[in-house]
Amino acid sequence: MIKSELVQIVAARNPHLYHRDVENIVNAFL
């Protein structure tokens, strides 16, 4: 799984989050 796919999945499951916040969350896990 690539980073952009992970961002899309997290964003889809958390529609209340801004895209940049989702990216920050993903970056924190990586």
UniProtKB/Swiss-Prot annotation:
Listed GO molecular functions? DNA binding
Q: Which domain of life is it from?
A: Bacteria
Record's keyword terms, sorted: DNA recombination, DNA-binding, Transcription, Transcription regulation, Translation regulation
* BP term (GO), one: DNA recombination
Function text: This protein is one of the two subunits of integration host factor, a specific DNA-binding protein that functions in genetic recombination as well as in transcriptional and translational control. Involved in hydrogenase gene expression.
What quaternary arrangement does the UniProt entry report? Heterodimer of an alpha and a beta chain.
Family affiliation: Belongs to the bacterial histone-like protein family.
Name used for this protein in its record? Integration host factor subunit beta
Give the source lineage, highest ranks first: Bacteria, Pseudomonadati, Pseudomonadota, Alphaproteobacteria, Hyphomicrobiales
